[in-house]
Amino acid sequence: MFTRVANFCRKVLSREESEAEQAVARPHMTIIPREQHAISRKDISENALKVLYRLNKAGYEAYLVGGGVRDLLLGKKPKDFDVTTNATPDQVRKLFRNCRLVGRRFRLAHVMFGPEIIEVATFRGHNEGSESDRTTSQRGQNGMLLRDNIFGSIEEDAQRRDFTINSLYYSVADFTVRDYVGGMQDLQEGVIRLIGNPETRYREDPVRMLRAVRFAAKLNMRISPETAEPIPRLATLLNDIPPARLFEESLKLLQAGNGFETYQQLREYHLFQPLFPTITRYFTENGDSAMERIIAQVLKNTDNRIRNEMRVNPAFLFAAMFWYPLLEMAQKIAQESGLAYYDAFALAMNDVLDEACRSLAIPKRLTTLTRDIWQLQLRMSRRQGKRAWKLMEHPKFRAAFDLLELRAQVENNTELQRLAQWWAEFQASAPPEQKGMLNELDDDPAPRRRRSRPRKRAPRREGTV
């Protein structure tokens, strides 16, 4: 009896504390009329509008929410549009034949229009500790949300979102924007602010720490002090995140057009180590090693390519970032084992990529390309005869040449610079000129294979067959 009373008291007290926290975090709801914001329906995907209109017509609340609203208010073009509603996932599926339900941790409806997917989420609610809540919401021992399918009201949903600037709701019914957490003011002031208690929210989902840094770099905003303070202390929580999810997050961080700024902030908040432990071991106090210079340069180059709408390949990014740890590993294996350098290099590739894949589940299709780029580095100086032409026929030659140029740039190595310049001229030359360049090479001729002489047989003794 005493235990039941104690549990009841704890439940009431925790609920009162939770409600008190919410009251502090939630300002009075602000409705921003059409004439006071920049969102226009012409800038919204037609398919997103179809979803909103059909949900409204069926009697459900429905709003555009998240990054789409944020970007529209900032005058940017959103990459995608998310919808939130009081309709359950099953109710959404009944309204749309082109819908499928996804996710176990967060149950979502994906309404598919060809290549475009409109994500529809039901308003999230708070866990009140009831038996039914325990079956639809689960936490790990470290506070991480393992499952969260408790539905609630729009007010609760606003509190459950991560950052205030992502908790703005656009209504297609009256063209207003609803703000429950002061997100509009933070957006105008350029502040990334977590909703609720930062440490609790980071423990629920440690990836929020990466998102804070990503949004700060992407939107050129600052992270509020209370949102930033716990990050270095809690950075190791990322070790509990599945490597496949961290791989996807790493691409969003480093290959979205703001990679260099994001990289600097990841280092500042101690978030780089859980993603790239191999690389972090080689960081220097001044940040001026060849490895750190090549990482900075490859990220700047990647940002420029994305701004110019050019293709980027994660395999090249990883090849550049892990190049100097690979060299050190190969040298160490060669010295300790007595293997030829080429064999030690092959073993080092395995070791470096195996460790990288333990924190980031880099797909095999990318690690294979990364290996190709690395192996070609050893062949770039061997240009005699037909080797140069054969090398240029390799599918990853261009990427390997780009890495060679990067190495020459960051190492300030005269020999590497001459080699990179030679390859640049060779690629741009006509076949007769290429032949002349090969003839002029001062390099030593390629070593010829020695013919193995037949062994001399011992003279036969008399009487033997």
Swiss-Prot record:
Active site positions, chain numbering: 80, 82, 162
Catalytic class of the enzyme: transferase
Keywords assigned by UniProt, alphabetized: ATP-binding, mRNA processing, Nucleotide-binding, RNA-binding, Transcription, Transferase
Annotated S-S bridges: none
One Pfam family it belongs to: PolyA_pol_RNAbd
Source species, domain of life: Bacteria
Region: Disordered, residue numbers: 430-465
Catalyzed reactions: RNA(n) + ATP = RNA(n)-3'-adenine ribonucleotide + diphosphate
Compositional bias ranges of the Basic residues kind: 448-459
Gene Ontology BP term (one): mRNA processing
UniProt entry tagged with the keyword Nucleotide-binding: yes
InterPro entries in the cross-refs: NT_sf, PolA_pol_head_dom, PolA_pol_I, PolyA_pol_arg_C_dom, PolyA_RNA-bd, tRNA_ntf/polyA_polymerase_I
EC number of this enzyme: 2.7.7.19
GO molecular function, one term: poly(A) RNA polymerase activity
Family: Belongs to the tRNA nucleotidyltransferase/poly(A) polymerase family.
Function: Adds poly(A) tail to the 3' end of many RNAs, which usually targets these RNAs for decay. Plays a significant role in the global control of gene expression, through influencing the rate of transcript degradation, and in the general RNA quality control.
Protein name: Poly(A) polymerase I
Organism: Salmonella typhi
